[in-house]
Amino acid sequence: MNGKANPCSSSSRKQQPSNHDVSSGGKDLQVATLPAYQISDSTWEERAICYFFDQFTIVECNAVGGMGHLGFLPSLYADCRDQNLGNPASLSLRLAVDATALMALSNRVNVPGVVTQARYRFGLALRRLQEALDLPAEAAKDETFATLVILSLFEDISGDRHGLTSAHTVGFEALTRLRGESQLGHAAGLDMFKYAYVRMQIEFLLLKGKPSLDSDRLVERLDSADPLQSLMIIASKVRQLISEPTSASDSLQSAGITKLASWIDSCRRLDSELFQWTQTLSDIWLPLETRTHTGEDVLTYREMIAAVIWAHYRVLRIFIHSVMADLFRALVSLLDSPGIQHEASQHEADGLRISLEMVSDSCRSVPFCFGEIDMLGNPMPPSEQGMSRVRAFYLYTMLWPLWYILSCGLATPEQTQMIRGVMARTGSEAGIKLATMLATYDGRDAMSSMPQLYSLERPVREVSVI
C-alpha cells in the first residue's frame, strides 16, 4: 500500500488492503498474452468467437459466491452449432453470437468485410428470432432469451441506439413475463434474468421510461443473502415507489400533503435499507482505501464484480436523495410551516452531502475500474496490444452508473472531464461504441422513440407462466 487509508465514511464501509490482498489481488486484470484473434491459422469467424467469449463472458468466481456473466453461453452456443439444430431458437442464437462477435472484433481490427458480415448475420438473427417469438414453445427457450441478450450487446457494441433508449426493452419485458418463475430455477435462466433486469431498471429509473412489466413477484424470489440479488430487491422497491410520483397527473403538489409525506417516509426507509445493505457485506465485497504513487486517494476492490455492484449502489442512493428533495420541495410549497421548512433544509443539506460523497467515491474508483492501477494503487503497465487491462464486460457494466454521475449535475468539472475521458477511451480500446456516445451525450432526447426491430405478437404477449 502506498499510503495510509482515510477514515471510513459514515455512509458506507471501506477497508485497507491486507497482507492477504497483496498476494492474491488483481485476478480480474488481464495479462499481456497473445490474443486469440491474432492466431494466424484461424478464420476471422473463429477469432471473433474466441475474442467475444473471452471479453464478454465471465466464468463463475467462487470467491464472490459463484458470480459470473453469461458463463453458460459458450457451451450453449457450441451445442447449437455442433448438433446443427434447425429450430428457430437455436438458429437465432448462433447467428446472434456470430454477428456480435464479428462486430466486437471489427472494432479491434481493421479488416474489410468484417462489419458487413456482422450486420448481415445480425439481420438473419432478427429474422430467426421473430420466427421463435411467433411460436410459444420456442419463445420460452433459453436460446431465445439468450439471443435477445446477445442482440442487446450488439446494439451497444455497434452504437446502434437512437438516443439513449434500447430497442430491446419491450422484448425483455415480454420474455421475462412469458418465462415466469421457472427461469429462476436454473443457473442460466437466473443469469439472464439478472442481466435483463438491470437493463430494464436502467431504462425505467435512469432514463425515466414507463415499465409495462410488474416483476415484483419474480424479484421477491431472489436470494437476499446474495449481494447483487439483494441490491436488485431494493432497486425493485425504489422503482415501485417512484412509479407513483412520476405518474401524478399534473405535478407533485397535486398528490396532496398526506401522500407527499408518505412518499418521503418511504424514501427514508429505502435509503436506510440501502445503507444497511453495505453493513451486511463480507470483507471481500468492501472497497479498499489506498493511495496511488502520485498521492491520490483512490478506492480499489478485491474483485471487479464488487466494483460494478458498488457503482450501482451509489447511483441508487443519489437517485433516492434526488427524489426525496423534489418531494420535500413540493411539500414545503403546500405548507407554511417553519418546522417543515427546517426539516426540508436539513434533508437537502444531508442529501447533498451523501450524494457528493457517492459521486466522489464513484470517481475515486475509476482508476481501478478502468485498469489504470492495481488493487494496491500501483500503476498498471500499458498493454502491448493496445487493449484495456480490464475485460470489456466490466467496462461495459460501468458505463451507465458513470453516465448518471455525469447527468445528475453534481460532478465537478474535473470529475466530469475524467469520466468523459475514460468513456471515450473505452469506446476506442474496448470497441464499445455506446461508451463513445455516452461520453459526448449532451442531455437531450433521453427517451427518443425507437423503431421496433421485431414484433411481439399474441403468442408472447398473452402466454404467461407467472
Model-identified regions with their sequence ranges:
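Membrane helical hairpin/interfacial module
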Residues: 82-166
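Generic structural signal of hydrophobic/aromatic residues within well-ordered alpha-helices
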Residues: 48-60, 69-80, 196, 218, ...
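A broad, low-specificity signal marking well-ordered, structured residues that form hydrophobic/aromatic
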Residues: 95, 145, 193-194, 400
